[in-house]
Amino acid sequence: MSLFPSLPLLLLSMVAASYSETVTCEDAQKTCPAVIACSSPGINGFPGKDGRDGTKGEKGEPGQGLRGLQGPPGKLGPPGNPGPSGSPGPKGQKGDPGKSPDGDSSLAASERKALQTEMARIKKWLTFSLGKQVGNKFFLTNGEIMTFEKVKALCVKFQASVATPRNAAENGAVRNLIKEEAFLGITDEKTEGQFVDLTGNRLTYTNWNEGEPNNAGSDEDCVLLLKNGQWNDVPCSTSHLAVCEFPI
């Protein structure tokens, strides 16, 4: 049997064995893909460790979140402009008669106070032993003799003023009251020869004695009511009867 016909087959087997041992599958696919086929991929291995955090990304657009809960009520706002007045309502029914209070409660507090004040003034008037009333004035005296300044102070103490006749009737009442010459509430202390009352008003009534006022001695700044009802100017430092007038 001849060996030559089997020689080519033997050489081919040797080349194939040698190539399979030295060449990888990847290289074989590159060099001889049509001849040698690689086997199927192996099983996946275990997951590796987490990598490091990447760089911070850019801010995203606002998302559409869920609607939140209703918040608490806000502060009370300023009052609005007043509205127009409404039309008058219907007339109500007639009420029952009220009950009048009894005794002292029938007087309001202001009325009681006024009454108490008036009673206090009357008590002061009663401290004088004599008095005359003309119209809405009381002319009263306690019979004391004193200077003009003391007469003014006495009358002020009793919430009164020095007697100042405004007409013949008042002048006559004071004349009938006195038994001594009395000071009147009239002076020319501020302007010589210009007699005024103690509030500074010019006189609208006078009843000067003949030849008066004459300012004898250059210091007669006060006025005296004589027993005959006429007036005379005298020094304010002299002492005479005190007569006060009280408005009523």
From Swiss-Prot:
Task: Indicate what this protein is called per its UniProt record.
Answer: Mannose-binding protein C
- Keywords per UniProt: Calcium, Coiled coil, Collagen, Complement activation lectin pathway, Complement pathway, Disulfide bond, Hydroxylation, Immunity, Innate immunity, Lectin, Mannose-binding, Repeat, Secreted, Signal
Among InterPro entries, the record links this protein to: C-type_lectin-like, C-type_lectin-like/link_sf, C-type_lectin_CS, Ca-dependent_lectin, Collagen, Collectin_CTLD, CTDL_fold
Basic and acidic residues composition-biased segments: 49-61, 93-102
Q: Does the keyword Calcium apply?
A: yes
- Modification(s) after translation: Hydroxylation on proline residues within the sequence motif, GXPG, is most likely to be 4-hydroxy as this fits the requirement for 4-hydroxylation in vertebrates.
- Subunit and partners: Oligomeric complex of 3 or more homotrimers. Interacts with MASP1 and MASP2. Interacts with MEP1A and MEP1B and may inhibit their catalytic activity.
Region annotation (Disordered) maps to 43-113
The gene name reads MBL2
| Cellular component GO terms, alphabetical | collagen trimer; extracellular space; multivesicular body
For molecular function, the Gene Ontology terms on record are:
D-mannose binding
List the PROSITE patterns: C_TYPE_LECTIN_1, C_TYPE_LECTIN_2
Could you tell me the superkingdom of the organism this chain comes from?
A: Eukaryota
Q: What is known of its domains?
A: The coiled-coil domain mediates trimerization.
- Taxonomic source organism: Pan troglodytes (Chimpanzee)
Coiled coil region boundaries: 112-130
**Leader peptide range in chain numbering:** 1-20
Compartment annotation? Secreted
What role does this protein play?
A: Calcium-dependent lectin involved in innate immune defense. Binds mannose, fucose and N-acetylglucosamine on different microorganisms and activates the lectin complement pathway. Binds to late apoptotic cells, as well as to apoptotic blebs and to necrotic cells, but not to early apoptotic cells, facilitating their uptake by macrophages.
